[in-house]
Regions:
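Conserved catalytic SET/PR domain of SAM-dependent protein methyltransferases, capturing the structural core
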Residues: 1-131
Length: 131
């Protein structure tokens, strides 16, 4: 669930991006997981899907090692693009999925995350994401 006002619009990073709809302060909570709405499935369930369904999960989601489940967000957080100079990140003190601002973020600035926090370089390259 996104906890700030936001906008979806064309991104200079890739396709559509998620942009702050208000000024955001360093450390401010941006996103938390929504266990009742997000998709969380086991490897066995993933294996039972047809290839098109798997492709959707591989594109929009990721395999969460700690829970040993495939995860896909239900909300617009899926439009947070990758950047090595990310504006948001997970804080090590939280065990559940969440994102906080790494620095002050201006209104209309794109929210980005370093995908290497939860995926390998190999995974990103397979998806065509520039590292």
């Amino acid at each position: 669930m996104i906890h700030i006002r936001y906008k979806l619009k064309a991104s200079e990073v890739h396709g559509i991006g998620l942009f702050a709809g208000e000024p955001v302060k360093t450390g401010q909570l941006i996103y938390t997981a929504s266990p009742l709405l997000d998709l969380n499935i086991t490897q066995e369930q993933f294996n039972s899907l047809d290839q098109k369904e798997k492709d959707e999960i591989l594109w929009w989601g990721f395999f969460d090692e700690p829970s040993q489940k495939w995860h896909v967000d239900f909300d617009v957080s899926k439009f947070i693009n990758h950047s090595k100079n990310a504006t948001v990140s997970q804080h090590a003190s939280h065990k559940e999925a969440h994102l906080v601002a790494l620095r002050d973020i201006a209104e209309d600035e794109e929210l980005t995350q370093n995908y290497l926090e939860f995926e390998t370089e190999e995974d990103l390259l397979k998806r065509g994401i520039k590292i």
